[in-house]
From Swiss-Prot:
Domain of life: Viruses
Function: Plays a role in virus cell tropism, and may be required for efficient virus replication in macrophages.
Lineage: Viruses, Varidnaviria, Bamfordvirae, Nucleocytoviricota, Pokkesviricetes
Family: Belongs to the asfivirus MGF 360 family.
Protein name as it appears in the record: Protein MGF 360-13L
Organism expressing this protein natively: African swine fever virus (isolate Tick/Malawi/Lil 20-1/1983)
Length: 353
């Protein structure tokens, strides 16, 4: 059972939880309820205390707020957040002075934070799909001397799993570099424009990585801008392969094919990753690497796919123009497009079952 709140903390909690907007700024500052140039507000969300403040303009979990307060050496907020129920052990992730370490010990912090706990914090922050979550993760985790090697190994596995095919991870890679690439990819995936600007300002060597992320996440407008306006380019067949690594990417596949990419190579890449939507879209565009694709599928153990690729039932979709290069025209063309050849194999499968 948690200890009862002190009278002082109870008053602060009451003030911070009120919806009244007329409380004087000086009173809030006196009560340590003014943070990042804005009133600090508390509210409950599914049984957990959330903090509203000026930090990134977003709501944050109480335990995450504690990590930030520790990083800022804000003694009063460390005490307040801990008494309100934040896990004081989370403070170990951002302690940077002896005085704060001593304070956290007095409040009950352990000597070390378990790797599992660090991993949970990382996932807790990234679960909130906002620009602020990316920026917040960067501020807490980048070049953090408190991270243990075991956690670094867990994080490498997570990044490899979530960016499968987009990124190659070697044991010699710097964790900070992998983290930046992971955050940038998530920012592109979910259109976190503020996070992209934040990372672009801090890191000047991400242009090629940005191009690859646009291909991977089917972002045709952004791809067009970076390729034609900013002139950031790589080999068109490499671009097409990147577009095929993640399934259901018709926009960027078509775009790269229209630039001159090899559609048979794209088809084989799609087979390798078992991306069914991409395979049959490549056939719609004229791909005909059936024998080679069947062999790759057989080697991978994709037996039905191997069999289906050598059926003499496919042909390119004559309704698809193959020379569009304007992203708006391509988007309009494919907005409600249903793959001709995917429909053929689905009908075939239905009939034999």
């Amino acid at each position: 059972m948690s200890a009862p709140l002190s009278l002082q903390t109870l008053v602060k909690k009451t003030v911070a939880s009120t919806s009244c907007l007329s409380i004087d700024e000086h009173i809030l500052k006196y009560c340590d309820l003014w943070w990042h140039d804005a009133p600090l507000k508390l509210y409950m969300d599914r049984g957990r205390i959330q903090i509203k403040s000026g930090f990134l303009g977003e709501d944050i979990d109480l335990c995450v707020a504690l990590i930030i307060a520790v990083k800022e050496n804000n003694y009063n907020l460390i005490k307040l957040f801990t008494e309100l129920g934040a896990n004081i052990n989370y403070s170990l992730l951002s302690i940077n002075t002896k005085h704060v370490r001593d304070l956290c010990r007095q409040l009950g912090a352990k000597e070390t934070l378990e790797d599992y706990d660090i991993f949970c914090i990382f996932n807790k922050i990234m679960h909130n799909k906002t620009s602020g979550s990316v920026i917040l993760c960067h501020e807490i985790f980048i070049n953090n001397p408190n991270l243990e090697n075991k956690f670094a190994a867990q994080l490498r596995r997570l990044i490899y799993k979530r960016l499968c095919g987009l990124i190659e991870i070697k044991e010699t890679d710097e964790l900070s570099e992998l983290l930046v690439k992971y955050w940038y990819a998530k920012a592109v995936q979910y259109d976190y424009k503020d996070a992209i600007c934040f990372l672009d300002e801090k890191y000047t060597d991400l242009n090629e990585w940005r191009l690859k992320c646009y291909l991977y996440y089917n972002k045709i407008y952004e791809l067009h801008d970076i390729y034609h306006k900013e002139k950031i380019q790589i080999d068109v067949n490499e671009m097409l392969s990147l577009a095929c690594i993640r399934d259901n990417n018709p926009l960027t596949i078509y775009y790269c094919y229209a630039l001159g990419g090899n559609i048979n190579q794209a088809m084989l890449t799609s087979v390798q990753y078992y991306n069914i939507g991409n395979i049959y879209f490549c056939i719609d565009l004229g791909g005909n690497a059936f024998e080679e694709g069947s062999a790759i599928a057989r080697q991978k153990g994709y037996n039905f796919l191997s069999h289906s690729l050598v059926l003499n039932i496919y042909s390119s979709d004559a309704s698809l123009p193959l020379n569009l290069k304007d992203p708006e025209e391509i988007s309009s063309l494919l907005k409600n497009y249903k793959s001709k050849n995917l429909s053929i194999i689905l009908d075939y499968s239905h009939n034999i079952l």
